[in-house]
Amino acid sequence: MSSKLVLVLNCGSSSLKFAIIDATNGEEHISGLAECFHLPEARIKWKVDGGKQEAALGAGAAHSEALNFIVNTILAQKPALSAQLTAIGHRIVHGGEKFTSSVIVTDDVIQGIKDSIPFAPLHNPAHLIGIAEALKSFPNLADKNVAVFDTAFHQTMPEESYLYALPYSLYKDHGIRRYGAHGTSHFYVSQEAAKILNKPLEELNVITCHLGNGGSVTAVRNGKCVDTSMGLTPLEGLVMGTRSGDLDPAIIFHLHDAMGMSVDQINTLLTKESGLLGLTEVTSDCRYVEDNYATKADAKRAMDVFCHRLAKYIGSYTALMDGRLDAVVFTGGIGENAAMVRELTLDKLGLLGFEIDHERNMAARFGKSGTITKDSSRLALVIPTNEELVIAQDAARLTA
């Protein structure tokens, strides 16, 4: 099978992750991260041929300068690789209801991404910059740019899952509903779980937990998403690094009316100062929480709230499985590495038949997949995610 090299771009508000991946076998030829955009220390790091390199982008540099560097410096050193690029895949955080699957980028698609900016005000504008710069930098691939939406996998949710108990006109007229996030990751690990269990995806019932600085849980029934913990925005649901997740909406009125906080201050509090950071008052890093669980009250407090919330979501989603749950799957930076999070969470779910195997749980870290429960237990798995591969495969498939 001939190679299909795809440039995968993930443009954040202040960073750009990139990789060149062979969609036929998953081989990664180049990968890197440009970060600290709009700051004096803007820089780019990349791996090629097993070696790591780094360079300054110049004070105030952003997406345009980063893509110029990728094209004119990194790829210029690899002309054969550059010549073999067949497509460009773009990760898009929010596609609203318009996009139920990956699509080739057109003017209509660009407009659809713009229309979803209110639901992803930090991410979608950055994605649009990435698309515009890619079209400029690779004119030969102008019709080979593909948008892959984090929300697409969740578009199979039934109405009872995605509607809020608000006036229905807010959904009809303004699109206010649950959309979810991390869909590409939830889809990938569902596929991988089906392979491990030797089942067709359309017969698979799993609960997938993508746990990173942002986190979400998804109920997958017969291979399709039927509910997910993130909502209109990625603020709803689990305790996250700096995000509160679920809370009583009236807290917002109390913060405004009784404590004099502005809407912007409340937004900052809930999105950037809460979660693990808020509970520890030290850090958003789960490694601190895990390392200090036995000795520091702040770490224990944060870990206990985090795992309590996660276990509640897993437990509630078992009600959507039609009487059969094949596995719970952990993925993402925390899901793949924080053995303590997995153990404390599954210990709360003994009623459902989960019993952790300590040795297996400790072995399934740092990029290793595996079963983490005892043979007599209901199954729990660790599966490292690979969103970039899904994006590359979708881009290759749609541009073939």
From Swiss-Prot:
How the cofactor is bound: the record states: Mg(2+). Can also accept Mn(2+).
Q: Name one GO cellular component term.
A: cytosol
The Gene Ontology biological process annotation of the record reads: acetate metabolic process; acetyl-CoA biosynthetic process
Can you tell me which residues bind ATP? K17, H210, L211, G212, N213, G214, D285, C286, R287, G333, I334, G335, E336, N337
What this protein catalyses is: acetate + ATP = acetyl phosphate + ADP
Taxonomically, which superkingdom? Bacteria
Q: Name one GO molecular function term.
A: ATP binding
**Major site of localization recorded for this protein:** cytoplasm
What Enzyme Commission number does this protein have?
2.7.2.1
Keyword field contains ATP-binding: yes
Q: Where does Mg(2+) bind?
A: N10, E387
Required co-factor(s) are: Mg(2+); Mn(2+)
**Metabolic or biological pathway:** Metabolic intermediate biosynthesis; acetyl-CoA biosynthesis; acetyl-CoA from acetate: step 1/2
**Which residues are the active-site ones?**
D150 (proton donor/acceptor)
Which protein family is named in the record?
Answer: Belongs to the acetokinase family.
Summarize the protein's role: Catalyzes the formation of acetyl phosphate from acetate and ATP. Can also catalyze the reverse reaction.
Q: Which NCBIfam families match?
A: ackA
Q: What is this protein called?
A: Acetate kinase
Q: Which gene encodes it?
A: ackA
